[in-house]
Amino acid sequence: MTRGTIQNRDAFLQNIAKRLGRSPRLSGVSQPQWDYAPQWTVFAGYSQDDLLSALREQCKLIHTDYIETTSSELAGALKQQVAAYGGGPVIVPDDPRFAEYGLSALLHDEWPAEQTAVHVWNSSLGRQNIDAAEQANVGIAFSEITLAESGTVVLFSRNEQGRTIHFLPKTYIAIVPKSSVVPRMTQAAAYIHEQIEKGAVVPSCINFITGPSNSADIEMNLVVGVHGPMKAAYIVVTDR
């Protein structure tokens, strides 16, 4: 991923300052320190097991299947959940973690031998990736950060992982390393901000996804699957 550039910033800020009737403030500006920060107290002191328990309970409220497994059993758990959702076609990002978590044989050998189509995102294929996502029954990706309070997975889009993997397939499975679970969005935003401060290249598209697609009108009629997958599952890998 290449770093973007900022253009016309100074002219833009000078125009705002002019409208405010003052000169631009180029120094002496610091981030305010708030007297109260209740957002940091949610789940304060929780262990990783406590956070996992909170995530498990939240999944019940957001209509999301919750599965716990270990690295050695992950391939079997993933295969079983894909079968529960009706099988392939499957689409996945080009992510080295699939190999690290022992899923290469399932993706490249076992499923193809069973006539389950697997598409690995390839940026050189362009529109073909989007077409594959549209035709896929299951999209699978790793959660970068997982919010226990809301049951949200945070997904970073990049050349090897287009955002349509998360939205176009009929169903979706997030692989959740236990170590990725944090209390809430506060910690996720702090992590992303920290990466920016370090000069890291942050994805232009960061998706916060909470279970399957849910929409409700003014009469509180819930409709599932209008803007994304109709079903979602989180497979938590407890030894990662």
UniProtKB/Swiss-Prot annotation:
An individual GO BP term: lactate metabolic process
Pfam families for the chain: LUD_dom
InterPro entries given in the database record: FTHF_cligase-like_sf, LUD_dom, LutC, NagB/RpiA_transferase-like
Gene3D superfamilies cross-referenced by the UniProt entry: NagB/RpiA/CoA transferase-like
Cross-referenced SUPFAM superfamilies: NagB/RpiA/CoA transferase-like
Organism domain of life: Bacteria
Function: Is involved in L-lactate degradation and allows cells to grow with lactate as the sole carbon source.
HAMAP family reported in the protein's UniProt record: LutC
Recorded family membership: Belongs to the LutC/YkgG family.
Name assigned to this protein: Lactate utilization protein C
Gene from which this protein is expressed: lutC
